[in-house]
């Protein structure tokens, strides 16, 4: 006998684009306005907190790729949706949005980090591709090896700087907020600072764009495959089609680290902007 069909909303969004990022924050931080500005979504915006009731996906365009941004319901000191952990499972990072004009914004940062820690979700300062000198190292003995914890590299977005004209200095902001998260002063009202998010995500997540071509034809330069730094020709072949990956013999590559049309093996590491022509057995 089959079980009953599951009913109710699905709180996990299937990842699309180069990476999925979760947008989290306290009520009235302007995170839904930020999501709408960045993605053109129809995220509901209201004067009162808790306007967002379910995950709202949207796509942030950066050059020839896109990042998927998921606007999640706000986190309050006395309430957080029970399905929040499930919603964060596919995410590769987070944008923590606070209202810099709110005197309690420092407490909000600590509160949200604490509430998520209770659910074994760690908002961490370190991004793989950002300067390690500007980031706090992770205690690898006590944290990084914990298989039951979700680690999300986090960008702190100090929103509503249009309401606090002294908030443009990121160093002063970081000192004021008492955090080592990478920090961006921004405004979802006039867009100040928001054009920096795409480049930061691209660098921080070590995204590599790889273009493919068919023998005898020009490369397909409008829709790159996206992988992480250190990925190989075989990794890209798996994205193209599992049968191609299974019968891959070699590839010809064009890029800054190879001669034009150089023959490379399946384990050849790829760089951003490389073009590959896959050859099968």
Task: Place the predicted regions along the sequence by residue.
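Generic structural hydrophobic/aromatic packing signal, biased to beta-strands
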Residues: 60, 69, 112, 210-212, ...
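A short, terminal or domain-edge coil/loop segment
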Residues: 59-64, 100, 104-108, 113, ...
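Short, glycine/charged-enriched secondary-structure capping and boundary segments
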Residues: 37-38, 82-85, 109-112, 169-173, ...
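Conserved Switch II/interswitch segment of TRAFAC-class P-loop GTPases
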Residues: 75-77, 89-139, 161-167, 191
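C-terminal-of-GTPase-core extension/linker across diverse P-loop GTPases
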Residues: 1-19, 24, 29, 125-281
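Conserved G1/Walker A P-loop phosphate-binding module
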Residues: 1-106, 114
């Amino acid at each position: 006998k089959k079980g009953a069909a599951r009913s109710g909303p699905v709180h996990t969004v299937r990842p699309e684009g180069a990476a999925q990022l979760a947008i989290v924050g306290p009520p009235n931080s302007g995170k839904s306005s930020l999501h709408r500005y960045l993605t053109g979504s129809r995220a509901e915006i209201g004067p009162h907190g808790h306007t967002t009731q379910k995950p709202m996906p949207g796509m942030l365009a950066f050059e020839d790729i896109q990042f998927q941004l998921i606007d999640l319901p706000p986190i309050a000191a006395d309430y957080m949706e029970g399905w929040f952990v499930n919603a964060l499972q596919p995410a590769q990072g987070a944008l923590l949005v606070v209202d810099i004009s709110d005197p309690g914004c420092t407490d909000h940062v600590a509160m949200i980090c604490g509430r998520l820690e209770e659910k074994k979700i760690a908002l961490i300062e370190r991004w793989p591709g950002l300067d390690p000198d500007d980031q706090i190292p992770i205690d690898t003995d006590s944290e990084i090896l914990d298989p039951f914890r979700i680690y999300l590299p986090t960008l702190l977005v100090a929103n509503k700087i249009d309401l606090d004209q002294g908030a443009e200095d990121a160093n002063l902001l970081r000192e004021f907020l008492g955090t080592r998260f990478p920090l961006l002063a921004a405004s979802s009202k006039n867009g100040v600072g928001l054009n920096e998010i795409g480049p930061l995500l691209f660098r921080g997540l070590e995204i590599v764009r790889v273009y493919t071509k068919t023998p005898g034809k020009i490369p397909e330069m409008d829709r790159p495959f996206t992988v992480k730094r250190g990925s190989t020709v075989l990794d890209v072949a798996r994205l193209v089609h599992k049968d191609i990956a299974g019968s891959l013999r070699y590839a010809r590559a064009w890029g800054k680290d190879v001669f034009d049309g150089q023959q490379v093996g399946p384990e050849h590491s790829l760089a951003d902007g490389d073009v590959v022509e896959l050859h099968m057995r």
